[in-house]
């Protein structure tokens, strides 16, 4: 893939799973702010401080990349790395994508789609759940240690 410029518009790390149980009960509150200006990535483990970090069942899907296609607060989609100007959903399974926001490249192997859940119709306008089918992002495994920051990013 030829290098292209895009933007990291949001980075999210949450120590808890906010969308558990029935949507009618409302999301679980976050114990600390989840929006970050930078994140630490660890190869094979995920994002430091995130609920999926170093969980054996989630190592191949520890980080979720998402295209900023939903109007409103990208935090509500609960995806880790939100990109503008790059079609994350076009990445095929098994591909490797590198992101470099200024601290050196961090590679991710794409494993599977991040399917939306019914919570999307609770935290976004009704119909978002259906609209995000096939556009919910990609679950990835980090292949390198590194740092990613909000702002311009080279993708290759």
Language-model features, listed with the residues they occupy:
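Electropositive, beta-rich accessory/interaction domains or terminal extensions
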Residues: 1-107, 112-113
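Short alpha-helical interface elements
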Residues: 66, 90-91, 126, 133-135, ...
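Short, basic/aromatic beta-hairpin or loop at an interaction surface
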Residues: 71-79, 122-136
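Short alpha-helix capping/helix-loop boundary micro-motifs
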Residues: 82-85, 137-149
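Loop/turn positions that initiate beta-strands
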Residues: 94, 105, 145-153
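A generic structural signal for residues embedded in beta-strands
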Residues: 99, 110, 150, 155-156
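Active-site scaffold segments
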Residues: 107-112, 128-143
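Short, surface-exposed beta-strand-loop junctions and turns on beta-sheet-rich folds
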Residues: 116-117
């Amino acid at each position: 893939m030829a290098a292209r410029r895009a933007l990291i518009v949001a980075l999210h790390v949450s120590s808890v799973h906010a969308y558990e149980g029935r949507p009618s009960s409302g999301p679980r509150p976050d114990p600390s702010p989840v929006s970050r200006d930078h994140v630490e990535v660890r190869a094979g483990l995920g994002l430091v401080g995130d609920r999926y970090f170093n969980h054996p069942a989630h190592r191949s899907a520890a980080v979720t990349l998402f295209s900023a296609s939903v109007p409103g607060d990208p935090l509500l989609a609960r995806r880790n790395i939100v990109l503008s100007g790059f079609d994350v959903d076009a990445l095929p399974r098994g591909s490797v994508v590198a992101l470099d926001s200024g601290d050196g490249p961090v590679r991710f192997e794409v494993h599977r789609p991040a399917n939306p859940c019914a919570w999307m119709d609770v935290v976004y306008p009704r119909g978002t759940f259906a609209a995000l089918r096939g556009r919910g992002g990609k679950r990835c495994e980090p292949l390198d240690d590194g740092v990613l920051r909000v702002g311009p990013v080279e993708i290759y």
